[in-house]
Amino acid sequence: MQRKTGLPEAEIKAKASYDIIAVGFAADEYALDLLKNENEKLNERFPAHYLKEAQRLCSEYPDESIIKSIVSKNHDTSLWPAGEGGVYGTLWWLTAVSSVGMRVFIDEIPVRQETIQLCSFTDVDPYRAASKGFYLIAAPNGKMIESILNESDIPACIIGYAAGDNDKLLIGKEGKQYLTKA
């Protein structure tokens, strides 16, 4: 089975109670495209130094070869690269292919403040924006994977877990909402 982005589905599926780990930052790809293609409009709204710093930060993708190496060494662990559907699209794919639900804590999903500002400027949800360089990992030992990645200078954090039902729940300060297919 192939994803819309042409990436093959993960060979190992997530199972209920597996941790879901975010690696990298959401919507960096979208922010970079915006900085490249809408620079003139952005310069009217944001200071040049802010845009330059945003471009520098959003260009720092995690090393995919290190991520793949860590995942391959850990039994029952799967890697899900984000694509054009962003974080939410990747969460949908992970849960649909694995036939599990999820409980994901929105406030735990890593997204840069600069990216939030740029997405807000264009009225785009950063969790649905293109997110090359962002990955989800489903693992039975999430804390260990998170620790190994962080020790390798790769930003990673547990954002939730796979559930035994089919409910795809996003949990935030405002309560719970269901993830809808984009």
Where in this protein do the model-derived segments appear?
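Helix-biased detector of long, well-ordered alpha-helical tracts
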Residues: 1-182
